[in-house]
């Protein structure tokens, strides 16, 4: 099991997915695929701020990958996602969740890898990095799950993710994405589709939001509605108070992964109490383009602003 978080080795002379370290067989690939920039009509010069406050252009962010792994496994996945994205919701909604999980997970982990590489370079050593053991475990597990791209990993009767793919009313929605690294939560919108994903929750967020997901089934969401749905996922991912644990069973060429019961010895619910005021602060951030204030959002503390006819909000504490 390759786990760079055990040694904090995020160098660019080894594959970021497999850990193979042979300079002659490494390829540098863009973190944001060229096909995605092309579809989004972006030049690659657009800038993004990393956690260390440095400003980088999209095109300057690259990742080292084993050439054969890239050609045999990653490129076919990229081509599958590219084809679906080019069509829009009709095809994106048909993608296997496993493929979306690997693609989104690679995208998100790519930022983590680049961030860690930059941080260690700046410090000159990994000794000064301050990362909790729970976060190290979460990231290490996520990286291991991504090895499903090129090895036979089997999730035994569970999915480690919650992924929602929704249709957007605006068929020409510009490409944008956001993420929360600590909770491995990701969302993006593009053309006529939106995706919200929690990558290590064993499907609990999908269950937590099942009422609103059922309510919007078959409906195209407005831009405000998609941001509201995203805000709910980001907030509930924050409230999720378990660190999933797994049993790994190698058997010949296959590795079986079993999820340990989330409840364990704990009696308390899997999610901390939903607080409308805190949720309102999250929603305010997601609704910035429309200028709604926190006061407007929680004017009625019992019924926060919602763009859904039937809000289906979780019960607040």
Enumerate the predicted regions with their spans.
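An N-terminal structural lobe/cap that precedes and organizes the functional/catalytic core
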Residues: 1-84
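Sequence-level detector for tyrosine residue identity
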Residues: 2, 12, 58, 89, ...
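Intrinsically disordered, low-complexity boundary segments flanking structured domains
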Residues: 13-19, 88-91, 174, 182-184
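Generic structural hydrophobic/aromatic packing signal, biased to beta-strands
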Residues: 15, 31, 104, 186-188, ...
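Short, well-structured alpha-helical interface segments that form or flank functional binding sites
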Residues: 26, 61, 99, 179-183
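Internal, well-ordered alpha/beta segment that forms a basic, Gly-enriched binding/recognition surface
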Residues: 46-134
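C-terminal, charged low-complexity interaction regions
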Residues: 129-317
């Amino acid at each position: 099991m390759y786990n760079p978080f055990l040694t904090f080795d995020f160098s660019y002379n080894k594959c970021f997915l497999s850990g193979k370290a042979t300079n002659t067989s490494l390829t540098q690939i863009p973190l944001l695929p060229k096909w995605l920039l092309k579809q989004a009509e972006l030049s690659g010069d657009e800038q993004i701020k990393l956690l260390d406050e440095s400003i980088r252009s999209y095109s300057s962010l690259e990742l080292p990958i084993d050439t054969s792994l890239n050609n045999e496994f990653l490129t076919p996945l990229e081509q599958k996602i590219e084809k679906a994205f080019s069509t829009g919701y009709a095809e994106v909604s048909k993608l296997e969740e496993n493929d979306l999980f690997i693609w989104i997970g690679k995208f998100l982990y790519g930022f983590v890898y680049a961030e860690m590489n930059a941080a260690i370079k700046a410090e000159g050593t990994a000794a000064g990095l301050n990362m909790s053991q729970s976060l190290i475990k979460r990231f290490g597990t996520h990286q291991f799950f991504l090895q499903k791209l090129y090895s036979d990993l089997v999730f035994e009767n569970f999915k480690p993710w919650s992924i929602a793919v929704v249709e957007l009313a605006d068929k020409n929605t510009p490409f944008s994405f956001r993420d929360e690294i600590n909770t491995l939560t990701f969302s993006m919108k593009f053309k006529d589709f939106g995706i919200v994903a929690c990558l290590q929750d064993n499907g609990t967020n999908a269950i937590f939001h099942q009422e609103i997901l059922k309510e919007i089934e078959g409906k195209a969401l407005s831009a405000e509605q998609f941001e509201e749905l995203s805000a709910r996922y980001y907030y509930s991912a924050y409230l999720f108070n378990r660190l999933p644990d797994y049993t790994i069973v190698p058997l010949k060429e296959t590795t079986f992964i079993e999820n340990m019961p989330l409840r364990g010895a704990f009696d308390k619910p899997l999610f901390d109490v939903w607080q409308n005021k805190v949720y309102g602060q999250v929603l305010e951030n997601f609704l910035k383009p429309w200028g709604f204030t926190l006061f407007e959002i929680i004017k009625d503390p019992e019924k926060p602003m919602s763009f859904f006819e039937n809000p289906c909000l979780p019960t607040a504490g």
